[in-house]
Amino acid sequence: MKASILSVTFFALLAASQPVAAQSSNDWENWPTGDRWRIGAGYFAPDLDTAIVVTDTGGNIGTGISFEQNLGLDDSEGTGLLNIDWRFFKRHAVSYRYFALDRSATTSGSTVTIAIGDEVFDIDLPIQSFFDITAHEVSYSYSLLFDQKKELFVGVGLSLQDLSLGIQGTESSPNPGEIINSTLDSTAPLPTLNVGFDYAFSDKWLFQSRLGWLAVELDLGADEDLSGQIINANAGILWKAFENVGFFAQYQLFDVDVDFVDRGVLFAIDYDYKGPVLGVSVSF
């Protein structure tokens, strides 16, 4: 009889303790850094620096061309950013990042020689150019350190840089009067190694930072190769003004240096976008 009473008591206590244990195991969801979902949208106002050198199939190296200084593209054009983070377990999370920026211009009267391989543009006649980029990044992170005040995480990611660029104008040499039309349309899949650190000053104020970097060489298929490196970094402050809505201010850097070989033509491209981001964040 005593054994039966003890057994019933034991299982009753065990059953009663389950909700408490379950609640305790998920206490991290109430931490300032413990949001299951966080979706952010911001306005990115970067300084833009885009350069290219094209080497033709004969090995003739063209001039270094700045899209902003030599071709007239805007050097400070804003765009939107989208961030989505999902913490599916306490120490495991996946993220998605997106931005796009399209620019075009027509210029004439350049003060420097502009050449694609051995083809030299007539700089006294109009030269049309465009540089469009769409970036998608997906990543996974694991929290090495995660408590009520701070989080240190590492992870891996893949940044898909969809590039489309072109320069069109009239040739001055070696074939005066002919039209030069040099374009590139390619997607650069650049993997990254990531590290980040977040710190909660209080329940409403958080410091957030993230760095992604990697250098890579890839064979993209017949007559197409890619090598390059990417730096993707940001740091800033998140203010959780309301229970599920916050506002953030951060500094963002995209620095990509890639060499494309497309049908024997080498495009060496370096683009550097850096500046402030202001946005709103929804968490739940």
Residues of each region from the PLM?
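Cleavable N-terminal export/targeting peptides
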Residues: 1-35
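Short glycine/proline- and aromatic-enriched beta-strand/turn motifs that initiate or cap beta-hairpins
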Residues: 22-101, 136, 281-283
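Transmembrane beta-strands of outer-membrane beta-barrel proteins
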Residues: 40-44, 95-99, 155-159, 210-212, ...
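Residues on the lipid-exposed face of transmembrane beta-strands in outer-membrane beta-barrel proteins
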Residues: 41, 82-86, 138-142, 156-160, ...
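Extracellular/periplasm-exposed beta-strand and loop segments of Gram-negative cell-envelope proteins
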Residues: 49-77, 100-134, 160-188, 216-227, ...
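Repeated loop/turn-to-beta-strand initiation elements of outer-membrane beta-barrel proteins
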Residues: 91-94, 148-150, 203-207, 243-247
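Mid-length scaffold segments of soluble, non-membrane domains
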Residues: 187-191, 201
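Surface-exposed extracellular loop regions of Gram-negative outer-membrane beta-barrel proteins
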Residues: 198-215
